[in-house]
Amino acid sequence: MDDYVGIMPLDELKAFTDRTYEIMMEKDPQPNEIGIFRQMAAARKEWIANGMPLFWIERMAREFREYFTYGVMEETPFKLSNTYPSVGRYLLIRMYSIGQKVFVNLTEAAMGQALPVHIHEHPAMNRLRELQSMIIAIQNDFASIRKELATDNETLNIILVVMHEYKISLEEAIVESLKIHDDMVREIDSITVCLPDFGFYQKMVEDYIYHVKIMIHGLNAFYYESGTKRYTQEGFAIPKYGTANEQSLDVEIKYIEHEYWIKNLKNNEHKYIGKT
């Protein structure tokens, strides 16, 4: 979905956001509307048929809207001006634009039960989901860096944002970005070893958190093991709103800790020094 809406004009994106919310709130699409709306309606009906409660459906609708409003729309000014956000602002935006605040809810659908509202909204649970989103966003940025170094107009990647704000080399930015990632992983572990007492729901919460962590591992494995070209220079989206100007970049990038990055990506750092 992010490829479809990521370079959509803001007026169209606003209408798309409103229509998404309506459909998730049980207003069926018209036969002539795009397939993504019909798929959303079909998914919503399947979730309801499988016993997911209305408050969970409403949460999905709300968090889809936040994905567009606080994620995709917040990225647009930086894309249009080809400028960098600060590291702090970037992480806030990416926490939404990565889409995980929406899709982490599917953990409950897979479990066949929704967390009660008072548990879902507990500060510890909210923080776990925020951390999960930002960790996955950073992992996504590492997986995408080879593709994004192949174009001259990409600024929304944690490595490039860190490099720009701290005025350091690409090699140093990779190391610093890994530190940010690892600090968040440690924070998740620190919270989960000292959970609040949720009483009757404690086992459900522990199962939920287990699957939240599995999503982090699973998505990171997908980036490198699925064979997708989504994260290579062949993976640029070229919808009606944009064009592709990517260049060939013969750099192999593996897992997040792979030293091959530092040796090979350093050759490309000159492209990003001085961009404001």
Report the location of each language-model feature.
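Alpha-helical, largely C-terminal catalytic domains
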Residues: 1-276
